[in-house]
Amino acid sequence: MDLGIQGKNALVCAASKGLGRGCAEALAEAGVNLTICARTEKDIVDTANEIRSKYKVSVESIACDITTSEGREAALKTSGPVDILINNAGGPPPGQFRDWTREDWIKALDANMLTAIELIKSTVDEMISRKFGRIINITSAAVKSPISILGLSNGARMGLTGFCAGIARD
């Protein structure tokens, strides 16, 4: 099936395994050139090599912590213009809300909401100027049906979902 995205450029976060890797492989199969990132260099390099050998697309990899400004800057510098942004991050640990500190909340919001917002801010204007862009935020089914022990994740991911629903109306 032709998705009309062949030759486009995607930045896929947390792409060495799981949903991020699945997205990277599906995009590569559709002919999209990739920049993939993850924290562990060996894992992301191995993933890039495997995708590169299987599909006829360009695959750049960078080991970085996308939740830091330095990590985001490095990923964006490596990627060049981004046509497709896949925001993806692992979730915070489960637990009981009475046990979570303010720092736990800040860390969850930073990883699962604010990082994605910063990446959107860094890419959306170029997408608009090129009259093409796709932003996919991988969150959780818990944004529709919250799970009590996943309060940190519920809050951060619902925040991102609500933010994006608002800006989509711009």
PLM segments and residue spans:
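A short, exposed helix-loop element centered on a Lys and neighboring polar residues
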Residues: 120-121, 165
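Conserved glycine-rich cofactor-binding loop
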Residues: 9, 16-18
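Substrate-binding pocket helix/loop in short-chain dehydrogenase/reductase
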Residues: 96-98, 104-109
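Conserved NAD(P)H cofactor-binding loop of Rossmann-fold oxidoreductase domains
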Residues: 88-93
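Catalytic loop of short-chain dehydrogenase/reductase
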Residues: 136-159, 164-169
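Conserved glycine-rich Rossmann-like NAD(P)H-binding loop of the short-chain dehydrogenase/reductase
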Residues: 32-46
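Alpha-helical segment proximal to the catalytic Tyr-Lys
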Residues: 125, 169-170
